[in-house]
């Protein structure tokens, strides 16, 4: 029998709910009927009665066991099943009938000592004129007395009085009938309960008394009925009330609830309190507020509590019949019913009350007239106890609702005290009683209020709330907000359940009323009330229900790359921080936006019953992506601005301060790392296969349905070479299998699908398949597959090369080998994408290589189990051989491998291919191919090749340092003739039969627990050239400046695409081959772009996937997983395909000479030197350029899955057919778009296509419009493009619907031959962000800057021009025209092209002259805000990509504070700013994405920072002296008087990653607020003399809470003038020049500033120093520089520099560089020589290369003889030619990159 049946029943109901929900998610409806029946049974009243009866029988058994033998127990059970003992059940005469007189009855077994005058006088005094009762109750031998008491503090000197709260029906006290509710107990066993007895002692007396309990109680006379009575007793209705109207109301519950709320008690009756508008009762129309409920069904509810009535209503089922009455004719008190917990008498107003001192208080009367059914519009709060002013407390006005009666009256103010309502004195009433009085008052309400005459209110109130709600009762915890001592105790220790029921009676009552007040039984209201109880009154809880459906596949396909899945489904972006998940933005027109309920900054608490609060971001986002609709969202909105208050924290945990600007984490809007789901055509195609003895010839896997995450689909994984499926040509990897003969595979598990396929008998099999929808550029290679005829079937056996290897259904996440892939800042941070990313040819291997690389980049571990693969044809007994030398790696070994999770593969067959079979079969093999010499146990000769579908979905990159890599023995069994034709994949291992071998891949990368490796490789001597100087000639600058990058993964934050590349310097590794042993490396990658970084860079190339430890490569210890191979024995692999790389390595001599790059580790702030670089000869340039031109193709778009099919062919006719087919598909793709579709091909000239592009003026729509056409460009010559055309594709790269950044990256990488798809719509002109204008002509000698309308000239020996430039959307037409008109000089900057002969692959075209990321003078591209460091003393523009986290900044200050500036308070280490590494605490933020924060308030700054997009552009100012020394703090003492029971009225916050505790908020009306000296952002240095500078927030909070009386604080405040002066200095040093030439280019600004500051310094110094002999003498400066160190200087000058042929001098010195550490170099020093090499006659670029490649001990000879003044003036004049607009001009984040690339290189 259950211990607590009610609780157990609720738990069972909850379990049933969860079970039903899970079954619904799985689509299982078979158990619905049984579960519903079970559910209804548990909810039925009969079942509740049975449970109650069981409990009563158990209780009776306990009673009977303890009743003496001479007693007879007369008991009964009530209708509900409760145990009731009848009167006279104890026959020994101990129970007496009540006496009606107040004198001592002769029946009493004891008589009070009347002679004791002192005792009597005390009792009389305590009774205060009330009726005195003497009661003697015999405590039973078992069980309790049957009543509970409550202790309430009276207003008389803080004395605590004990009142009877409740008398249990059927108990000893109830049968005695003398003890009543609300009786005040004056004495217990002759002990008076005066001020000498505490309430704990009184309760102990009640509980510990044995035998007879003698009580003296005081009771109000029952005949008192005056409306002004001070009695708080529940008014007892007359025994015979004549009702004016009695009516029977029947309501049929339709599931939405009854729609009314009740209130009341036993004696006053239960009354209808509220009627929900639109609810059932409201629609019925008969029930009215104020109706007394007399009977429900056949149950008389008079005398019941409201909770009992609520239970009766719940048990009624759907039909509720009630007898209600209204308009009593009898005299009923207007005093509202009060709960039993209140005292019986209203104590008189103390002499210190507000009314007594007219000098301090004024009393006034207000008359309010209700409008139709509306509330009065005031919100009240109660305070019980002694306030900090010593005055009596009571009910205060907390807030006034705008538009209400109180609001229009105008006389009532917040903090007014309400003393009477309609003449009824309410002093001493609790909140909910006053609420009832106000609610039950008539149309006209008279209020008597008291207000302090002084301006500074000392009322004990919190700041007013903005919540616009009607007056509503507060929950019991809020009843007495500060000083309540309500202690409720059961005095008799009854049965545990009854005790619990009594102790929680009030809470249950209130909760039941709240539920009924809303829509009863409504899940939304239950959710709301549950969270309201948890969060308290400071939060508004909202429940929203969404039922969204993705309309069709095309819609999801169109947007899936632009928005995260959860954003697409819910229509909100979610930022997460520390377990809180906030809505950061709402998608316009999305589901949540349509609902109109939620706002940004609302916190998401729960979705579909899953609590998100407290969960990590990864858990929350993962759940939101998978949770099925409809969605029930529970959100909360903070109603107050206070934080983790020192006084009264709202939550148990420390609240997050408001000043943490970015609590949140942003979702990468591109969702680069979450992979992308495949989509299939809804059209089902029937493929007929003839099953033979070998099966159908394909393998399958299950895959998450992109449209329903709870379901899976069956997908063709791979085809068996020369199998039935491959020969038919109708089935291809990636096809979705929907049916087999008559069997539908919808929602079928993988195992079931396998069984169905295996069970199909041999013969004709009908397969229903859906082809994948693809958008990739390789669509053109799959035209045969989509054609209606099958006439070309026979070609597939010879042309499909290893298709399945390109099918990875979940895009992977990044390298696992974290130590090697840390982010690192480089010396030249600007990453021009220029020519290093030449687009590649449309080679057939592209798709394969791309997906191989994705496979190499390892998906998350948990995703491995989602892609189990089963080969469904053959049997798998072949794998059961226990021979350890047969390295086929059964499942058990895979499971043992610690770094690789089990894939749960089942191999149902293999196929053995003879070496001399037709090459088509070998070329078409799928999966991982294993060659084993140990095949003899199966009876095959060594020449045979065993092919097996090893289908590991990913190969984690295992560090080469781990020595337990599993290795197989591979022999030279591959026929190399077929290799020339095959498209070599990861799974194919070509080995020369006779010569040296090269292991390109390992079939299964798994690690065993023990050292089970076979000794396969013999040790041989190897030689490694570790110093670059030993092979200088091969290290061209094309390697040194390569920008490809492997993604890094932030621990705990998911995987994130980095902002830019951090490759170390190239190095040479020599590996000597060993006879008959492979090199021991496997490679991955190729031409295809694998990943796009956030700044538009592309990740591509050949990478080392694994190095076998005992192999020749492994023995060198010089190669590791993730290294990028730049060159092999003179063959450039930077743009090589996978097959070309394999051939190059295979054909390399002995030794094999690799040039490789590794990712460097990430320093936090210090920038790193980039790479060593040497110029290469013209022949090398030419050769490399020829190779690159041979391999030019397109960069693929962000990948859709599955990848497209490929068909190798060289037939020109087929190419034409393919193009026609592709064009047809393109037209189909955009058939729904309005306008005329055009497909053209253009040949770029040296200036690009001659197009100017802009976006859509509607920022929510992503479009790319042609706004200008150069009359001399290819587009104008072709004549088919017009202004207003919208670009959809370039070289099959889809631009439609893409962001500006994506489009920019694709445009930049376009090759010379460009295929454009665009649409022409007449309305386009109205949609364009920039008014169209013609682009003036340009020539190689004079390219005018047109704000980005011209192509960037990326010069390589003056030979090639690359790129289509976009017009920044923030530039208006007028600005663009004015810039053209104001150009003073041709901006074909000759110093760029002539000084720096860049290598073909360079992507740092403009940064070679600048090591610090700051502007040299060579090109305006030298400052990249994404990478440039922050120079102290000047305003800097920086960009930070948030990735998967928020910015992670906490700020202080604002125009509404004395600080008058927005200053970074802390940089949180998990945020994007910390990863970026440039922002420090103390930096001032001047602008955020064009929003000027110089004059913004604190809240405005927080809003601006929170509502930032993915890329955040900041203008910051740093003064290193600030916020670091206390000399910058204004230190002053503040003394606050802390009153008893009150706090100081301030909230604090500490740094999580540093020391210091700061004031985050001042509570209105608190001690700190009244003092008026403290502000937000002040630092608490000490408390009562105790140093708090290094204390934690918790420590300071505890000390402040425990402090009493006078609290002495020492406060530190950043000096108000310090930031102003700092900004003035900044403006003097930088802004003044900008005012003189407002168009100064950002790249010149730092140099001009530095030089002019230096000039100013020199001017104020002694003029004699200019000719000082010591300054003019050469100085030798020695610098020690490690490989990872940044030199940290910028130079200017050199032959052919824009300043003229002047000597090279130091233009800037970065504080974090090694040069600055010497403290011997100065800005303006002329560099005479570097390591003994004179610089006379060298060009700027030559000197740059010398410095960049100088490591170790660097000797500089310098002379301080540069004429800085002349150079600074010359720079200032030059900078006016750039006219980029004021630096403070507004701009959009999308335009930041373009704004810095407006001039030619």
UniProtKB/Swiss-Prot annotation:
Positions of the PDZ domain: 134-221, 248-328, 365-453, 553-639, 686-772, 1068-1160, 1239-1322, 1437-1520, 1533-1615, 1676-1762
Localization terms from the record: Cell junction, Tight junction; Apical cell membrane; Cytoplasm, Perinuclear region
Record-level GO BP terms: establishment of apical/basal cell polarity; establishment or maintenance of epithelial cell apical/basal polarity; intracellular signal transduction; tight junction assembly
Compositionally biased region (Acidic residues): 1210-1221
Modified residues (Phosphothreonine): 1209, 1508
Domain annotation L27: ranges: 1-65
This protein's record includes keyword RNA-binding: no
Primary localization class, coarse: other
Tissue: Expressed in renal tubules (at protein level). Expressed in bladder, testis, ovary, small intestine, colon, heart, skeletal muscle, pancreas and cerebellum in the brain.
Any one of the GO CC terms: cytoplasm
Keywords in alphabetical order: Cell junction, Cell membrane, Cytoplasm, Membrane, Phosphoprotein, Repeat, Tight junction
Subunit structure: Forms a ternary complex with PALS1, CRB1 and CRB3. Component of a complex whose core is composed of ARHGAP17, AMOT, PALS1, INADL/PATJ and PARD3/PAR3. Forms a heterotrimeric complex composed of MMP5, LIN7B and PATJ; the N-terminal L27 domain of PALS1 interacts with the L27 domain of PATJ and the C-terminal L27 domain of PALS1 interacts with the L27 domain of LIN7B. Component of a complex composed of CRB3, PALS1 and PATJ. Interacts (via N-terminus) with PALS1/PALS (via PDZ domain).
PANTHER family assigned: INAD-LIKE PROTEIN, MULTIPLE PDZ DOMAIN PROTEIN
Name of the protein: InaD-like protein
